[in-house]
Amino acid sequence: DAAGTMKTGWVQAGSWYYLNASGAMQTGWVNDNGTWYYCNASGAMQTGWLLDGSTWYYLNANGSMAANTTVDGYVLGANGAML
């Protein structure tokens, strides 16, 4: 920040980004206190449908991964993957 303090956790700079304990920007899957999020290659938090490899996931408007629910008629299991 402006005072030179290293930021960690979620930071908003246009999009939301996750900075790990060493202050490095995280990409890929992020587990924050038991809730899963996904940050793309530029580090921005994703929302909506995500195809990771050959598996579909749904990320809510707040970025959290949906699980054990139905979205747009598609069933998501306990691990968030479309069944």
Regions found by a protein language model. Name each.
Residues 1-83:
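Extracellular adhesion/carbohydrate-binding repeat motifs centered on closely spaced tryptophans
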